[in-house]
């Protein structure tokens, strides 16, 4: 009996060992090509599975004991060996490096310098023992699953491309199958001119002397020799510079006849502002002349020297969006060249674009009243037209009359001032104008700056001042004139931003007038004027942060309901059972008496 059990145990072990051997199956997965060099013999699991884009880290790779493997496989073509007689960096197939193990010297091997390898992997639990003739590894992925992988040496990436045979019979078929878009054999049809230039469009020029439309040229180097090509057009809004040489066999004859050496050939034309100007060449509003930014003299042959030849051309082009080109200027740098056979000249061509700006007198930068929020005590900034200044109040002289000098309104500071005005005019309209100018100052403020660093060019940083002049219809007197005698400037402001660093800004402002009627055409009158400024803080304080809610344990009113119900039900049951017992005893007693 023991012998039979021993035989059965040996049979099971043999069956398990046979099934554990690596067999080709549908569960094996081939991984794409990766670059490797030589095998590593230690059998240690790795922490990363083989990837299709990266080479598996050579941690666990076993080799047969008697196998002979070339650790530096020779390739028929070494694509990275670009320097003869010199070792190219990271080129593992370069024979000039004379390295047996290139990876020990290089940080990596360039693609194409080593043979590709593919991996076939199965679950590691299926493997009992491996006797594969190929290098093997055990990988562990991030989820902890281990895989047993075998590297094969016949990767498809090492196969050669199929060479196409081209002859007169299949030439057209191959060109149609693999060919793409090419240059059109016929020039495209002429399209109607667009309304405005787009970035990269060639710039149109017009020569009035010959009535010819051409393009603004920017010669550039072309070909292996880098000679100047005149046909290169300048692109709209593409600021760039080009450099190219010119060679002259006979400079003596070319000195005065070659257009490329004459500065006049670079400005004796007009530039079209927009492409649609080509439809009306007689309309000068679509054309911009090329102006000279520097003096340029014509070429001159003096003895053995060619003088005043162009060595640099600089175009400055100002554009204004869809309105096109507004101004074109050109400047030159000229030099002299000695006449000799095969002489050369290096020329530079620069085209620079910039935005068109109306020329204005530069105004000094006004000081800020804060950055960005207003600072208390700094002037309140106002705007009239495009001019920024500070708001002012009346100022009186020693005799009480209104002075030409005025007090500046300081942000956050309430103030009041007054003076006596002796009008020079007696006409009502002129009198009203004089009084208004005295109250407001000149010029009259129209907008107030929201922040202390407001820019006059940015209208979004200013808010209009609300005002309403005195109503003439409110006076019934025909010979009376209604004039303002008091001006109250109300400024609403608030803090913005963090409470630790608040920024004051103006939310709005208005002028409030108190009016008075005076007799028209009355000479020698004096009018008492008053101005006051009032700053109102409308800052809304945020709600203070609340504490964490405190725990207030309260039991519901029916928390003990189940227990009460059970107790009440138990009492009723006890009461019913007592009644039942009494009934049984009573029946027993009656039965005993009847017997």
Swiss-Prot record:
Segments for region (Disordered): 23-62
Organism superkingdom: Eukaryota
Keyword Membrane among UniProt keywords: yes
Gene Ontology terms: biological process: apoptotic process; cilium assembly; positive regulation of apoptotic process; smoothened signaling pathway
Residue intervals passing through the bilayer: 576-594
GO cellular component, one term: nucleus
Glycosylated position list: 167, 336
Location in or out of the cell: Membrane
InterPro entries: Tectonic, Tectonic_dom
Polar residues composition bias: residue spans: 49-62
Signal peptide range: 1-22
Side Extracellular, residues: 23-575
Membrane disposition: Single-pass type I membrane protein
Protein role: Part of the tectonic-like complex which is required for tissue-specific ciliogenesis and may regulate ciliary membrane composition. May be involved in apoptosis regulation. Necessary for signal transduction through the sonic hedgehog (Shh) signaling pathway.
Family: Belongs to the tectonic family.
Subunit structure: Part of the tectonic-like complex (also named B9 complex).
Name listed for the protein in its UniProt record: Tectonic-3
Source species of the chain: Mus musculus
């Amino acid at each position: 009996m023991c012998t039979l059990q021993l035989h059965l145990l040996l049979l099971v072990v043999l069956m398990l060992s046979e099934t554990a051997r690596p067999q080709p199956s549908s569960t094996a997965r081939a991984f794409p090509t990766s670059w490797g060099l030589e095998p590593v013999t230690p059998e240690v699991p790795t922490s990363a599975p083989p990837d299709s884009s990266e080479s598996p880290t050579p941690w666990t790779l076993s080799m047969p004991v008697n196998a002979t493997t070339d650790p530096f496989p020779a390739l028929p073509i070494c694509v990275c060996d670009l320097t003869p007689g010199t070792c190219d960096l990271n080129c593992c197939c370069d024979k000039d490096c004379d390295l047996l193990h290139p990876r020990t010297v290089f940080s990596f091997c360039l693609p194409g310098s080593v043979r590709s390898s593919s991996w076939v992997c199965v679950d590691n639990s299926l493997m009992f023992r491996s006797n594969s003739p190929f290098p093997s590894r055990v990988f562990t992925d991030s989820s902890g699953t281990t895989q047993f992988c075998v590297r094969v040496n016949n990767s498809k990436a090492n196969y050669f491309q199929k060479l196409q045979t081209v002859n007169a019979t299949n030439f057209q078929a191959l060109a149609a199958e693999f060919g793409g878009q090419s240059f059109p054999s016929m020039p495209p049809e002429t399209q109607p001119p667009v309304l405005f230039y787009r970035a990269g469009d060639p710039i149109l020029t017009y020569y009035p002397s010959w009535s010819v439309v051409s393009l603004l040229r920017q010669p550039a180097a072309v070909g292996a020799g880098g000679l100047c090509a005149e046909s290169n057009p300048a692109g709209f809004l593409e600021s760039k510079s080009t450099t190219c040489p010119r060679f002259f066999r006979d400079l003596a004859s070319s000195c005065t006849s070659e257009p490329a050496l004459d500065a006049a050939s670079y400005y004796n034309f007009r530039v079209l502002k927009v492409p649609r100007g080509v439809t009306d060449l007689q309309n000068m509003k679509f054309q911009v002349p090329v102006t000279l930014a520097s003096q340029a003299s014509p070429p001159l042959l003096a003895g053995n020297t060619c003088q005043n030849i162009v060595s640099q051309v600089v175009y400055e082009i100002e554009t204004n969006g869809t309105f096109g080109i507004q101004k074109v200027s050109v400047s030159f740098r000229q030099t002299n060249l000695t006449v000799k056979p095969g002489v050369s000249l290096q020329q530079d061509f620069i085209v620079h674009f910039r935005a068109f700006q109306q020329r204005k007198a530069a105004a000094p930068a006004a000081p800020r009243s804060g950055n960005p929020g207003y600072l208390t005590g700094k002037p309140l900034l106002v705007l009239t037209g495009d001019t920024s200044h500070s708001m002012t109040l009346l100022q009186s002289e020693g005799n009480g009359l209104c002075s030409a000098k005025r007090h500046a309104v300081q942000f956050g500071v309430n103030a009041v001032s007054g003076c006596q005005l002796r009008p020079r005019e007696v006409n009502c309209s002129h009198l009203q104008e004089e009084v208004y100018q005295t109250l407001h100052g000149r010029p009259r403020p129209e907008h107030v700056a929201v922040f202390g660093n407001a820019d006059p060019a940015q209208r979004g940083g200013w808010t209009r001042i609300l005002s309403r002049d005195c109503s003439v219809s409110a006076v019934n007197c025909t010979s009376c004139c209604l004039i303002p005698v008091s001006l109250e400037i109300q400024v609403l402001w608030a803090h913005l931003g963090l409470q630790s660093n608040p920024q004051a800004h103006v939310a709005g402002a208005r002028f409030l007038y108190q009016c008075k009627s005076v007799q028209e055409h009355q000479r020698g009158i004096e009018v008492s004027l008053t101005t006051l400024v009032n700053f109102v803080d409308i800052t809304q304080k945020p709600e203070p942060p609340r504490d964490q809610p405190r725990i207030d344990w309260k039991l519901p009113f029916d928390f003990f309901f189940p227990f009460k119900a059970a107790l009440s039900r138990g009492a009723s049951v006890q009461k019913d059972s007592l009644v039942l017992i009494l009934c049984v005893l009573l029946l027993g007693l009656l039965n005993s008496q009847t017997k």
